[in-house]
């Protein structure tokens, strides 16, 4: 079983930035464009306009800013032939269930339990929508009581997608999700000293 670094080459690829290019030209002799000789003035009297343009046009309105959204990196359970993670990038608004985001984005969630009547359709009783949170835990709600019961024998960073809320409508950030963690062919090198929600609750 291979080991995947969170900062490895397969996941370092970030979303392409938005580039804006501007080019300014400088007139060497700006006054020459406004200079008119008598000969030119006479010629302009014989010229008839066939189309007109408004003397002044309002400045172009700035493009509206994109609404806040959360970026997702969904990592498939099977690596690519070259051994790198098979990552699928998605973007969605916060304030939604992780299950809804994955299904709406055509991300595999249930694996062999995707057939009708093979899962509870998001109620939280079957525990077949398990995912592993690799990064971005701070954008998610704490584990629910249902998760604590259903996942008590699973690693602390495993969640049920149907019980996981992703931030608020104005949230931004990156969440890295391991799909189908029970069938993954690799392991994540995640620091062990990161506190989890259960530890924080027991210490208070």
From Swiss-Prot:
Region of interest: Disordered: 1-24, 45-68
Subcellular location per the Swiss-Prot or TrEMBL entry: Plastid, Chloroplast thylakoid membrane
Superkingdom to which the source organism belongs: Eukaryota
Keywords per UniProt: 2Fe-2S, Chloroplast, Iron, Iron-sulfur, Membrane, Metal-binding, Plastid, Thylakoid, Transit peptide, Transport
Pfam families: Fer2
Keyword Cell membrane included in the entry's annotation: no
GO molecular function: 2 iron, 2 sulfur cluster binding; metal ion binding
Transit peptide location: 1-48
Knocked-out gene: effects: Malfunction of the NDH complex.
Purpose of the protein: NDH shuttles electrons from NAD(P)H:plastoquinone, via FMN and iron-sulfur (Fe-S) centers, to quinones in the photosynthetic chain and possibly in a chloroplast respiratory chain. The immediate electron acceptor for the enzyme in this species is believed to be plastoquinone. Couples the redox reaction to proton translocation, and thus conserves the redox energy in a proton gradient.
Keyword DNA repair: no
Residues that coordinate or bind [2Fe-2S] cluster: 120, 126, 129, 162
Organism whose genome encodes this protein: Arabidopsis thaliana
Name of the featured protein: Photosynthetic NDH subunit of subcomplex B 3, chloroplastic
GO BP field: P450-containing electron transport chain; photosynthetic electron transport in photosystem I
GO CC terms in record: chloroplast thylakoid membrane; cytosol; NAD(P)H dehydrogenase complex (plastoquinone)
Domain 2Fe-2S ferredoxin-type: residue ranges: 76-180
Quaternary assembly: Part of the chloroplast NDH complex, composed of a mixture of chloroplast and nucleus encoded subunits. Component of the NDH subcomplex B, at least composed of PnsB1, PnsB2, PnsB3, PnsB4 and PnsB5.
């Amino acid at each position: 079983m291979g080991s995947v670094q969170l900062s490895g080459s397969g996941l370092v690829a970030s979303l392409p930035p938005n580039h804006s290019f501007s080019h300014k030209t400088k007139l060497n002799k700006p006054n020459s464009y406004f200079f008119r000789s008598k000969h030119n003035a006479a010629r302009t009297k014989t010229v008839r306009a066939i189309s007109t343009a408004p003397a002044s046009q309002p400045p172009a309105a700035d493009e509206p800013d994109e609404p806040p959204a959360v970026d997702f990196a969904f990592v498939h359970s099977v690596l690519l032939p070259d051994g790198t993670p098979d990552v699928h990038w998605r973007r969605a608004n916060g304030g939604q269930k992780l299950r809804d985001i994955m299904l709406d984005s055509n991300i595999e969630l249930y694996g062999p339990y995707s057939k009708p009547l093979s899962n509870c359709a998001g109620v939280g009783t079957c525990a077949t929508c398990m995912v592993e949170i690799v990064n971005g835990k701070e954008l998610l709600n704490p584990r629910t009581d249902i998760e604590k019961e259903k996942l008590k024998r699973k690693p602390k960073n495993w969640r049920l997608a149907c019980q996981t809320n992703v931030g608020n409508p104005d949230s931004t950030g990156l969440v890295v999700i391991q799909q189908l963690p029970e069938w993954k062919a690799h392991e994540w090198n995640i620091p062990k000293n990161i506190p989890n929600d259960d530890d924080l609750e027991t210490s208070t």
